[in-house]
């Protein structure tokens, strides 16, 4: 492998913003934000909206998503004109 062309693979903290769940793993993603982890060290912080801690498939909770407004808007926009 060529040196200097590959991204740095390091430990980062992912924060699920919807459930406030944090987990430490390794990634090549960059972030300007950092967070102090349980071991006392600072790691880059990557914020995500959805993870296994909040996704309905993994949690078993069913969440109703209100799409009625979008469907009605679509139907009005593309309804046949008689």
Swiss-Prot record:
Signal peptide: none
SUPFAM superfamilies referenced in this protein's UniProt entry, alphabetically: L28p-like
Gene3D superfamilies attached to this UniProt entry: Ribosomal protein L31
Alphabetical UniProt keywords: Ribonucleoprotein, Ribosomal protein
One of the protein's GO biological processes: translation
One GO CC term, this protein: ribonucleoprotein complex
Subunit structure: Part of the 50S ribosomal subunit.
Name of the featured protein: Large ribosomal subunit protein bL31B
Organism encoding this protein: Amoebophilus asiaticus (strain 5a2)
Gene: rpmE2
